[in-house]
């Protein structure tokens, strides 16, 4: 999976736990969207998390 260009978020791994505390490996993926942003004044198409988009850490091109 891709990595967030701004915050560096990527897939994290851990265990899913049932009520009986049985464990199964699983992955948590960030909500990434491919958007055009301004990097050094030029538009660039990169993967950005929706959290970074909502918080205003990115200026769209």
Swiss-Prot record:
Entries under PANTHER family matching the protein: 50S RIBOSOMAL PROTEIN L28, LARGE RIBOSOMAL SUBUNIT PROTEIN BL28A
GO molecular function: structural constituent of ribosome
Gene Ontology BP terms: translation
Statement: the UniProt record of this protein carries the keyword Repeat: no
KW Ribosomal protein (keyword) present: yes
Family: Belongs to the bacterial ribosomal protein bL28 family.
Name assigned to this protein: Large ribosomal subunit protein bL28
Region entry Disordered, spans: 1-21
GO annotation, cellular component aspect: ribonucleoprotein complex; ribosome
Gene: rpmB
Cross-referenced NCBIfam families: L28
